[in-house]
């Protein structure tokens, strides 16, 4: 079975489930705190994805946000709803993310945003696509031309935005790391900075950006993989400038 075709069809199927419940969720549970939440729809969506992978790829392992942390040379990485807060509040910027990793390298990734009817995907060596159309990162070579994005991180975000708003056209926070990263690949944003994040949030976006001609590193500027903790996704042309600003912020707040 073709893994990419399997992944796209599966996430679109799960997307139909999410749209039934989008903005209509009554039972919201806290995980690590009031900003880190989960719903029964997260769990149901994850079960759907896991069941299909177990059925068609029974010898392969799974890492999924809601409590599955297997390891292995052939690994599927799942985020059933990336942007649960947006999903619960009826905001459209949420996504389902699925990546396949072989021997530590991401081989394919799919990010599906059902409320936006957008599917972004890539497979190693085959390019990146948005609803079937080939995509490339932007060609903006000056920060003054750029729209960047980041997540909501205590200590880091405010200081990062303060610095970048003076240098860029604008900074946006979408609330879905997977979608944020994929949008770098689509050229919708020029860079995305994420801080202390998990593999299921960014694994699919990582290969989408790379296959779209972009660059993905950690905060030191070294090439990142799905299991790095801090990421800078960019079109490559303004990457060094973003690394510089990020490290100014990290130094100021005294953390890595």
UniProtKB/Swiss-Prot annotation:
Documented activity regulation: In contrast to mammalian I-1-P phosphatases, is only weakly inhibited by Li(+), since 50% inhibitory concentration for Li(+) is about 100 mM, and the Li(+) concentration required to totally abolish I-1-Pase activity is 1 M.
Entry keywords, A to Z: Carbohydrate metabolism, Hydrolase, Magnesium, Metal-binding
Residue sites binding Mg(2+) 2 per the record: 79, 82, 201
Enzyme Commission designation: 3.1.3.11, 3.1.3.25
Keyword Cytoplasm applies: no
Family: Belongs to the inositol monophosphatase superfamily. FBPase class 4 family.
Subunit structure: Homotetramer.
Protein name per its UniProtKB record: Fructose-1,6-bisphosphatase/inositol-1-monophosphatase
Species in which this protein is naturally found: Thermotoga maritima (strain ATCC 43589 / DSM 3109 / JCM 10099 / NBRC 100826 / MSB8)
Name of the gene encoding the protein in the UniProt record: suhB
